[in-house]
């Protein structure tokens, strides 16, 4: 954890406070009530990342990486290029990734237009995240097209979830 961050622990059992990590604030309450109170407290909070977000947005506009690369065999950038073409035609599309290089390609090259359009486990290293998260996204947004970008290892860990996708009528690509 970043030493500068403040850690809040919400629990219904006070004996759990500071058990695994020292916290700055302990809230003895139901999680729903505690999170609701925290959210309410954030209203009017100044976005401390506004300057960075503006700089990053300008950087992205200037630094367009070439992804329309026609090589044989096909290269990862070309796959992301084709997915971007689909996203540009279908703004409701949701993309999930597994971990590994496929995740890095997506994070570097994917055009994300809105919040919750790109779902990834980030740096948590959860191999096998891609397909189950795609199925979950489809369950939450059944009218949206959902695709996952995964590798052989991640797919092999959760390939049985294709049966879940079919059984629950939650088609994903």
Q: How would you describe each model-predicted region?
A:
Residues 1, 37, 59-61, 144-145:
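Short secondary-structure transition/capping segments
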Residues 1-55:
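Glycine-rich, acidic loop regions that bind phosphate or pyrophosphate groups
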Residues 13, 100, 154:
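Catalytic metal-binding/acid-base residues of hydrolase active sites
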Residues 17-38, 104-173:
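Thiamine diphosphate
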Residues 41, 45, 86-89, 140, ...:
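Alpha-helix C-cap/termination motif
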């Amino acid at each position: 954890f970043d030493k500068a961050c403040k850690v809040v622990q919400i629990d219904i059992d006070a004996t759990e406070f500071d058990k695994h990590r020292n916290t700055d604030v302990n809230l003895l309450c139901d999680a729903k009530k505690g999170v609701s109170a925290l959210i309410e407290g954030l209203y009017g909070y100044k976005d401390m990342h506004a300057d960075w977000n503006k700089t990053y947005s300008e950087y992205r506009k200037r630094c367009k990486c070439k992804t329309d690369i026609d090589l044989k065999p096909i290269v990862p950038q070309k796959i992301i290029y084709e997915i971007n073409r689909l996203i540009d035609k279908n703004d409701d599309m949701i993309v999930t990734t597994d971990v590994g290089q496929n995740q890095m390609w997506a994070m570097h090259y994917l055009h994300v237009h809105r919040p919750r359009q790109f779902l990834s486990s980030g740096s948590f290293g959860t191999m096998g995240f891609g397909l189950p998260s795609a199925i979950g996204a489809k369950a939450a947004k059944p009218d949206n097209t959902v695709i996952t970008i995964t590798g052989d290892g991640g797919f092999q860990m959760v390939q049985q979830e294709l049966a879940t996708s079919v059984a629950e009528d939650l088609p994903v690509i």
